C-alpha cells in the first residue's frame, strides 16, 4: 500500500460531517438498464430485524441505481438469505435510469416498497411531497444503535427520519498503478499544484494520457463532472464557501464556483484525457478502469466504489505485482485535507410490517458485514467496491486498503457530503448534470453553465 496513504489514514483528527441539507451521490453501475438477481448467499448471523415474525411469503421490491453485477448479487444474496428466516421474498432491481424511473413509478402510483436514494436531496423532495413514509420508533432505535448522528442527518427531513444509510462512499481518491509511475519516474503528488504539474509533465512526455475520464451514465450523465467540481470548491474556496454554495447562500454564478468549474475543464483537455468512447461525454463512467490497467492513462479520480468496476482479476495495493492498482488522496490546495463523501439511503414507500422489517435489517451492522462478505465473493476476492460506516462491524471483513478508507472517513477534519446530492433534485440531479455536460462538450462557457444552473434553483 502507498506509504503516503497510510500516513494520511493514521492522522487522528475529529470527524466533522456538516449538514447543509440532506444528500448523497453514487451511480456505481455496469452496462445494461435494469438487472435483478435472486438472493441466496451468506445470511450472516442471527437476524435482529423481524425477530420470530412470519410474513407469509410476501414479496418486498427494492430499486436503486447500483446495477453492477457484484452489487446486485450482494444486495440480493444478503437480503434474500436473511428474508428466508422471516418467510419473506426480497427482490432488488438495479436501474440505469433510476432517477427518471422512480419519478414515473411514483407518479403512476406503483412505486417499489423500498428504494435506494443516491441523492438525499431527492429523498427530501419525496418526503415533503408525502411519497415516502417516516421511520417508526423501533426502526429509528436500530438506526440510532448503528449509525452516528452525522450519517443519520442526511436521511432526516425537517426533523423527521425517513432514510437509512445503506452505503458510504469516499470520493476524494485517485486510482493509479504504482509500477507505471515508478517506471516513468513520477511521484505521487501531495498538493494540487504538484498534481497539475504532474498532469502537464505526463502530457509533455507523450506516453499514456494523464487521466482517464468519462461522464456518460444514462439519465445521470454528468454526475462525475459534479464530483470534480465539488472537490475543487472544497479545495480552492474552502468548507465554509462549500456549505453556503450547497444551500444557495452563495449562488452558482459566484466567481469562486465558476473558478472551480473552469479548473476542471482546463484539466480535461484532449492532450490530458483518454476517453475510450471517443469523447468524455460519450465515455461511460464505468469504462475507465480497463484503460488504466492497460496503460492507456496514468490516473483516474473516482470514489472507493470504483474498485468493483476494475477488470476481473485486478490486484490492489500489492507491491509485488507490477500491474497492481492503488490509490492516493486527491491532493488539496491549502493543506487542510478535505474529503468529499457520499452514500445511499434506503427509504420506504409504505409502512407495512414486512417493509419495515426489511428497513430495520438494512440499518444493522449485520447487513453491512454480510453485504461486504457477499460482494467481496462476487468480485472474486478483491476489493469489493462497497463500504459502510455502520458502527459495530467486524473490521476484518474489509481488506487493508478498504479499512484505510474507513479510517479516512472517520478521521477527516473537513468532510463534506456530495454537494449536488444535497441540492434540490432539479438542480443537483438536473441542470448541474446537463449544463456540466454541455460545458464539457465545449458548447457553453463555465459562466454560461453557472448562470443557467443558478436560474433553475427553485424559488
What are these regions (language model features)?
Residues 80, 184, 313-381:
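Extracytoplasmic/periplasmic substrate-recognition and gating elements
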Residues 381, 399-457:
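C-terminal capping/gating helix-and-loop segments adjacent to ligand/active sites or protein-protein/ligand interfaces
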Residues 23-124, 129, 141-143, 334, ...:
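Conserved N-terminal structural module of periplasmic/extracytoplasmic solute-binding proteins
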Amino acid at each position: 500500500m502507498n506509504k503516503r496513504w497510510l500516513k494520511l489514514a493514521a492522522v487522528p483528527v475529529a470527524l466533522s460531517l456538516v449538514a447543509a441539507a440532506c444528500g448523497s451521490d453514487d451511480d456505481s453501475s455496469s452496462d445494461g438498464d435494469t438487472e435483478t438477481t435472486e438472493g441466496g448467499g451468506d445470511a450472516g448471523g442471527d437476524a435482529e430485524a423481524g425477530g420470530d415474525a412470519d410474513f407469509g411469503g410476501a414479496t418486498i421490491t427494492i430499486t436503486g441505481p447500483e446495477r453492477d453485477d457484484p452489487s446486485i448479487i450482494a444486495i440480493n444474496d444478503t437480503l434474500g438469505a436473511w428474508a428466508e428466516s422471516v418467510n419473506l421474498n426480497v427482490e432488488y432491481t438495479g436501474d440505469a435510469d433510476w432517477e427518471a424511473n422512480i419519478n414515473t413509478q411514483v407518479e403512476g402510483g406503483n412505486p417499489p416498497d423500498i428504494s435506494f436514494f443516491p441523492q438525499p436531496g431527492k429523498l427530501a423532495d419525496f418526503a415533503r411531497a408525502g411519497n415516502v413514509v417516516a421511520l417508526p420508533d423501533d426502526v429509528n432505535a436500530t438506526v440510532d444503535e448503528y449509525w452516528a448522528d452525522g450519517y443519520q442527518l442526511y436521511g432526516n427531513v425537517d426533523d423527521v427520519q425517513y432514510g437509512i444509510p445503506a452505503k458510504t462512499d469516499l470520493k476524494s481518491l485517485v486510482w493509479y498503478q504504482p509500477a507505471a509511475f515508478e517506471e516513468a519516474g513520477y511521484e505521487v503528488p501531495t498538493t494540487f499544484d504538484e498534481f497539475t504539474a504532474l498532469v502537464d509533465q505526463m502530457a509533455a512526455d507523450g506516453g499514456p494520457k494523464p487521466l482517464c475520464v468519462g461522464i456518460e451514465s444514462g439519465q445521470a450523465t454528468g454526475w462525475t463532472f459534479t464530483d470534480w467540481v465539488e472537490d475543487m470548491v472544497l479545495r480552492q474556496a474552502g468548507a465554509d464557501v462549500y456549505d453556503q454554495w450547497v444551500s444557495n447562500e452563495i449562488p452558482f454564478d459566484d466567481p469562486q464556483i465558476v473558478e472551480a468549474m473552469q479548473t476542471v475543464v482546463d484539466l480535461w483537455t484532449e492532450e490530458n484525457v483518454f476517453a475510450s468512447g471517443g469523447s468524455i461525454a460519450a465515455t461511460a463512467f464505468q469504462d475507465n478502469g480497463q484503460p488504466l490497467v492497460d496503460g492507456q492513462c496514468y490516473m483516474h479520480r473516482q470514489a472507493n466504489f470504483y474498485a468493483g468496476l476494475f477488470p476481473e482479476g485486478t490486484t490492489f495495493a500489492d507491491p509485488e505485482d507490477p500491474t497492481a492498482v492503488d490509490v492516493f488522496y486527491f491532493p488539496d490546495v491549502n493543506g487542510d485535507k478535505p474529503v468529499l463523501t457520499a452514500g445511499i439511503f434506503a427509504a420506504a414507500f409504505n409502512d407495512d410490517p414486512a417493509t419495515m422489517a426489511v428497513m430495520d435489517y438494512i440499518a444493522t451492522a449485520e447487513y453491512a458485514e454480510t453485504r461486504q462478505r457477499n460482494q467481496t465473493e462476487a468480485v472474486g476476492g478483491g476489493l469489493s467496491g462497497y463500504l459502510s460506516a455502520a458502527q459495530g462491524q467486524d473490521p476484518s471483513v474489509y481488506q487493508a486498503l478498504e479499512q484505510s478508507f474507513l479510517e479516512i472517513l472517520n478521521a477527516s477534519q473537513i468532510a463534506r457530503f456530495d454537494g449536488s446530492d444535497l441540492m434540490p433534485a432539479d438542480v443537483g440531479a438536473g441542470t448541474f448534470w446537463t449544463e456540466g455536460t454541455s460545458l464539457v462538450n465545449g458548447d457553453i462557457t463555465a459562466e454560461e453553465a453557472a448562470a443557467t444552473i443558478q436560474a433553475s434553483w427553485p424559488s
